[in-house]
Amino acid sequence: LMLPVRSEGSVEAELHEFQEAEGAAPLRKTISRDSDYQWEVTTDMKSGVLTEHQWFDEGRVTYDDHDGWTVESTHDEYRSIHPDDPLRAKLDITWTEHFERADWAVSSVTHTLVTSTATEIKVEADLEVRMNAEVVHERAWRLAFPRQLL
């Protein structure tokens, strides 16, 4: 490994120190549900499958200076595998996003499942979007990709 080395008296001696970083003040907000986080790893003693489960709840927050803009977000993620059979690996994720202001609300739920066989990676995904509790958009994907050395 050959790395460049600067000689003494190089241009760095003439450089000025960086100034303090600038940034906007945090937004004023009202928290109506605190955020939460859970993370666990389990082993099914009968099947031997190892599962990692992560739950992220970003809470419920209303931004005071933005006309009551309210935001909620949760992510529920599972990753599992059998140590002796990596082809049984599975990723299962559900994300929920919700936004509202006054008498308007919109939310989305996405669910993605990734599995594999000896020859391909399979992806199943679903999306549901609601406006004021009415479903306004749905879509489903069913895809398969060659493993290509994976």
What are these regions, as identified by a protein language model?
Residues 1-150:
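Glycine/threonine-rich phosphate-binding loop and adjacent beta-strand/alpha-helix elements that clamp
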